[in-house]
Regions:
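Intrinsically disordered, low-complexity regulatory segments
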Residues: 1-169, 173-175, 200
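Prokaryote-biased recognition of long, low-complexity C-terminal linker/tail segments
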Residues: 6, 168, 172-206
């Protein structure tokens, strides 16, 4: 059995249709030797300081520089604070089940740095060690999918693409968290936020 992972439900269902995986299950499609499942975009993110045992960073804690970085399930804000996204939690369990039931994996996430990061983060988070290959397509036509499946790429060919996305993500974390906590320490207020993108944009329009 071969697992296929996409980063959108509609993409997964379309690929499943093309490959003849027509049986619908909870969170995946199966049939013709395939189990096709999906994420809801990026369901994982870099962990927050409290996940490293730092509840309220003091001056001596700076700079925050985790080694290694940890991953966590995406959180959503509620009336009682930030909690794990239940949809992400449930779908991660489905993906783990699908991966466990298959011998090999095809990464069919978006053909981009972000798409590569979605798969690699999930692969790391689940501590998966099964062999995988990459489906690299820019169209969901039957012809494009079938051609891509006939010409699957070695996952290692996209290592540099993942490293680029991962480095950008970690740089955003380092800049955003350190700068935001630092300004909160300086001003004595807790509602300040700085970041690689938002700060120059706000400066440009102010």
């Amino acid at each position: 059995m071969i697992a296929i992972l996409t980063d959108k439900p509609n993409v997964g269902k379309e690929i499943a249709r093309i490959l003849g995986a027509q049986t619908r299950e909870n969170g995946y499609m199966t049939g013709n030797g395939y189990m096709v499942t999906w994420t809801f975009g990026n369901m994982l993110s870099l962990a927050m300081p409290k996940d490293y045992g730092i509840e309220r960073p003091e001056r001596e804690a700076f700079p925050l520089n985790p080694a290694p970085f940890k991953l966590m399930v995406k959180h959503v804000k509620t009336d009682t604070g930030w909690v794990p996204d239940i949809n992400a939690v449930l779908q991660l369990k489905v993906i783990e089940k699908v991966f466990a039931a298959c011998d090999t994996i095809i990464a069919a996430t978006d053909a981009s740095r972000e798409g590569e990061m979605v798969f690699r983060y999930l692969y790391q988070y689940l501590d998966c060690h099964k062999p995988y290959r990459r489906l690299w397509i820019s169209s969901l036509t039957d012809e494009a999918v079938l051609e891509g499946m006939a010409n699957l790429k070695a996952g290692s060919l996209f290592n540099q693409m993942f490293l680029a996305a991962d480095s950008r993500n970690k740089a955003d974390w380092l800049l955003g968290l350190n700068a935001s906590y630092a300004i909160c320490q300086t001003t004595g207020t807790g509602n300040n936020s700085l970041g690689r993108v938002q700060t120059p944009v706000l400066a440009a329009i102010s």
